[in-house]
Amino acid sequence: MFKTHKIEIEWAGRPLTLETGKIARQADGAVIATYGETIVLATVVSAKSPKPDQDFFPLTVNYQEKSYAVGRIPGGYLKRESRPSENETLISRLIDRPIRPLFADGYKNDTQVIVSVIQHDLENNPDILAMIASSAALTLSGVPFMGPIAGARVGYCNGQYILNPHIDEMSESKLDLVVAGTENAVLMVESEAQELPEDIMLGAVMFGHKGLQPILDAIIKLAEVAAKDPRDFVPEDLSDLETAMLEMAEKDIRKAYTITDKQERYAALDALKTEIINKFMPETEEDCKFSVDQIATVFKQLQAKIVRSNILDTKKRIDGRDLSTVRPIQSEVGILPRTHGSALFTRGETQAIVVATLGTGEDEQYIDSLTGMYKETFLLHYNFPPFSVGETGRLGSPGRREIGHGKLAWRAIHPMLPSKESFPYTIRAVSEITESNGSSSMATVCGTSLALMDAGVPLARPVAGIAMGLIKEGERFAVLSDILGDEDHLGDMDFKVAGTANGITALQMDIKIDGITEEIMKIALEQAKGGRIHILNEMAKALTSARAELSEFSPRIEVMNIAVDKIRDVIGTGGKVIREIVEQTGAKINIEDDGTIRIASADAKTIEAAKRWIHSIVDEPEVGVIYQGTVVKTAEFGAFVNFFGSRDGLVHISQLTTERVTKTTDVVKEGDKVWVKLMGFDERGKVRLSMKIVDQKTGKEIIGEDSIKAEQEKYTEETHKSENKRRRKKKEE
């Protein structure tokens, strides 16, 4: 019934298998990939023809994690998987980025790649396996995909690179790097690092590229026996149109690209484009040789050729800069004084307002992943409104690009954050891109670093980021620092590097062509380092380190620790006690399983009141210490005083005052506030208190130290006499 094909190899000490022909047979391509005991299903379907007037390649990649893969039922009311999580969105982008450049130019058929994690062993991360399975399914599908590609994860521990470390090994690694590529070229890199130098990062990229070669061989072997016939696809030949347009418009295109202002340049190019379309479009549709989309496509190609050749020939760029110069930078902090921290970072025509907010344990984000539930204390959100590029557009939930850019900035900042023990706040940074002409994600990194320091977050060191580009034609190439949006679109590489003066914390690279050598990447990294140091120096003009004090509008958090067996006492039955503390004091209280308690409030007195309350629950009263209490009951032999949380003690009638007392209520009544000293405990553990040796106005002791022992002995004797008298009277009755 099934005609299956299977390839199995040993990779990084674990078995990896690729199988096709049994599941999802109606898809154009389908592969079951297994690594260890993690299993993913990847499918590819591409439409047989493009939609009318389609002027772009509509590729969609959907990565989804099924809860049943780890034997769990989804939470929530519906009890089923719903909208993609942030992690699923990021992995969808991770798969998309290396495969998109490998589709044939001009291919515009609707194409969808769906990857599902159907089993997870909690040891082998499914993201790399999903990338491999997607590449294999595309290679088998017959669509014009110039692959295969493969991916690998690289860790770095004790001076050694690790290929595909287990999930639990990553906690010890100073590097989390994902690399994807073909046999001869690196296409994509994504990483977070602990301030590693450029040579270590480059070595990791090359180590990973070498490590993924066996996967490429396995996919090719599978394709030799299972691939479908290639689809008939012949790219449009628009060479005649290109020649004619070049003769007509080359001079005007070059002139437009001498305009350094983005908006003015775009206006000139739009006017030129309209003029060209009008010249090539006859009055009647029957006489049309080319469509508007074809004319627009060739116009864009001509722009790329002219800009690229001009950069290679003159070493000058669109805005007049040389290859390594960074645009002018202006940094400001504290621009929103009532927020906890804020910064405005402007680099050329790219600008970000970043605002930092400090919260408590209640503000931590609960993240439900296949590996389990965990709490995130650092949140970074990136917003890219349409007005930032002078356009109109929708507003709403963040798109994939916004999520991806935010995560890149998160990776850049995260290694420099203080530990939760030394800075027990939940931190949220929001980057509002107000202008954009290239490298807005790196502006977010710079702005976030400044805003956090303005908020008093003690970063280990400031962090800056820079986006690099590449123009390559044959053996000639130019590496560009701090690229513009046009240089990103028309170039061959988008290479973002973020870090401190000591090393790299995040790196993201997308390469659109083959032939990027190790030497070119080395030059790009060194040039990026110079740019990063320059940006850090410019940022230092605004702020060099975290402010010594938090904003007056920030919450204060104090940490205390209690014994684990006392947690239930603080929480109380059904949370009764903790709710009462919160309601009465106004403080926010977070209790962790190890007995760590975080108390938060903008008011120091509120925090102190909550601390005293908790201490009164978990601490034991100390003999010889004076406490303030409340009379809760009176009797003929004395008064009961609540003096330590829920703890009550007896002040014997002889200890109410230095004068002789015949009736307790002559001295105190229920509800009175009194000062008492803890004298000790009787043989039954009952508390013995005294009022007469404490000044009731000041709460200070009024009997000298030499008399304390005698007073305690007298107290014990009188208490025994009173107790014996009470028992005799009760017996007589």
Curated annotation (Swiss-Prot):
PROSITE patterns: KH_TYPE_1 (PS50084), S1 (PS50126). CDD domains: KH-I_PNPase, RNase_PH_PNPase_1, RNase_PH_PNPase_2, S1_PNPase. SUPFAM superfamilies: Eukaryotic type KH-domain (KH-domain type I), Nucleic acid-binding proteins, Ribonuclease PH domain 2-like, Ribosomal protein S5 domain 2-like. It is an enzyme of class 2 (transferase). Its main location: cytoplasm. It catalyses: RNA(n+1) + phosphate = RNA(n) + a ribonucleoside 5'-diphosphate. Residues 555-614 form the KH domain. GO terms for biological process: mRNA catabolic process; RNA processing. Its cofactor is Mg(2+). NCBIfam families: polynuc_phos, PRK11824.1. Belongs to the polyribonucleotide nucleotidyltransferase family. This is Polyribonucleotide nucleotidyltransferase. The gene is pnp.
